[in-house]
Amino acid sequence: MTRLLSLFLLALVSVSAFSQRRSEQIRVNQTGYYPNAPKIAAIREFRTDIFHITTPDLADTLYTGTATGPNSAPYSEVETWLADFSNFTATGVYVVVIPELGYSWPFEISAAVHEPLAKSSLKAFYFNRMSTPLPWEYAGKWARPAGHPDSHVMVHASASAENRPEGTIISAPKGWYDAGDYNKYVVNSGITMGTMLSALEDFPEYYKNLAVNIPETGNGMPDILNELLWNLRWMIRMQDPYDGGVYHKLTTANFEGRLMPAEAVNQRYVVQKSTAAALNFTAVLAQASRILREYENIVPGLADSCINAAVYAWEWAVENPQIYYRQNDMNRQYDPDIVTGAYGDGNVTDEFMWAATELFITTGDEKYFRSVNLFPDTAMPIPSWNQVRLLAYYSLLRKEDDLPKFASGNIEIIKIRLERLANELIEDLGSRPYHAVMGSSPRDFVWGSNSVAANQGIALINAYLSTGNRRYLDGALHNLDYLAGRNATGYSFVTGHGHRTPMHIHHRPSDADPLPDPVPGLLAGGPNPGQQDGCDYPSDIPDESFVDDWCSYASNEIAINWNAPLVYLSGAIEALQFDAGYSGR
């Protein structure tokens, strides 16, 4: 009792006398927390024993707790203390106060606290649509004219074929701008589409009720599927109808300047067919086909068209299993030189696994399942654009009840390995400086590291769906906390969400328009000690190697394959909040 009274009296003094300034050293999820979920703040380089939760005006102290620490990462000398206020469940808006240091950004505690993020991360894909104007009704102040109709695309010399020789003009409209540039890449669309189609398959009721104000809203299909169809219809046009092969990308010869889409009018090409493109195409269209069956009355015949195209591309890939995209070699042989994103993948074993799995699930034809080795080794690599093995595993787990018995042994292996991965991800979580799965190793901080955090979260959610172990879902939630501000940089990495967010992302429409605010809902790439862009960074420490500057395409660019796992992560946690007990009904 004496200790509690002392803490209370100290709280009265501390909050009023020492905490009249906001401190960047206090890191919180700037969006907020669910009432009954874990709630943690991290305090950098300031030793503290106690913390308080107060109203934003500091007038009322509502909770006092004991901080723990110090914690640090093996690659950094920075120490943190953790303030765990999970037991504080009152809804409202609050700040964390550290005596003699200051107070945090305000945050909300409420049910559905991440719904705006789930909506915005999905709506971001609408803002990246090409071949259509974005009117004020749907885009607000980010309205713009149409860019890149892609109705006059030239077949590049590298893609020349008997029925489509060099210089042939084809039409391949729609799709999304891939990243900060204005090109479209089939390989990167693969993991992007697969991740978001999986979100819809895993949480169909949630997404059927999630509307984001796009032109198709209210047409009888979920908005996530409406948005995916914009890119799917472009992907279909990337298949050569004469042989089933798929062009690797649709691109200008070089990157466009810092222009708005309608002003970027250089000639565009479809470039070389590749095995990786064909297999990504196969997987996406096979998965899309089974989802579209439910909407046959709205998009008649599209499900059949998708599975037929998927099989056609698979057959091409089987006949051409090692056609790799090597841009430098291609440029030595053909003109004009193409120097945009390569997405060259020299190992397509995982793409064969994923494509075969999706064909097997959709068609029921076991020849696809038996055509690949699902377990070439024991690895469980977190997905990325050039590593899609786990997408195959996730689909098999998702459809376990619909599969023939001969597949059950493989599914049990996947369950065991996924649970092992989940345990590795959350091991020693409480001793990490920001109480996040992300950042346990400097290897997490690659180009697009924030997508690593989001994809780690997806792995943990799949483990939760498989086992019911809430520790895995908590781990996924902690990575969302990381992305929303509880990290070494202090940034909430999603544009328009939080109080300190990237304002100068490497994204041409956001840079070239006259608005100070970037397009909302976009996930910045995140800390990258490789610093390949040569910009000035504030730190070489892996988890701090981020700069909010247009020049930093290595840490501050956006990309569809980084946003897609954010869509899944934020939407899944929203969908699961009541079943997991994070929020009351």
PLM features: residue spans?
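Bacterial Sec-dependent N-terminal signal peptides
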Residues: 1-21
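Aromatic (Trp/Tyr) and acidic
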Residues: 27-103, 111-112, 127-190, 194, ...
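Acidic/aromatic-lined carbohydrate-recognition and catalytic surfaces
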Residues: 75, 103-119, 207-227
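Short coil/linker segments at helix-helix boundaries
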Residues: 198-230, 263-269, 287-306
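Carboxylate/His-rich catalytic cores and anion/metal-binding grooves
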Residues: 222-245
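Proline-centered turn/helix-capping motifs that create local helix->coil transitions or kinks
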Residues: 239-248, 321-329, 364, 430-431
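Hydrophobic, small-residue-rich alpha-helical packing segments that form membrane-like cores
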Residues: 311-315, 319-322
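Solenoid-like repeat scaffolds
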Residues: 375-382
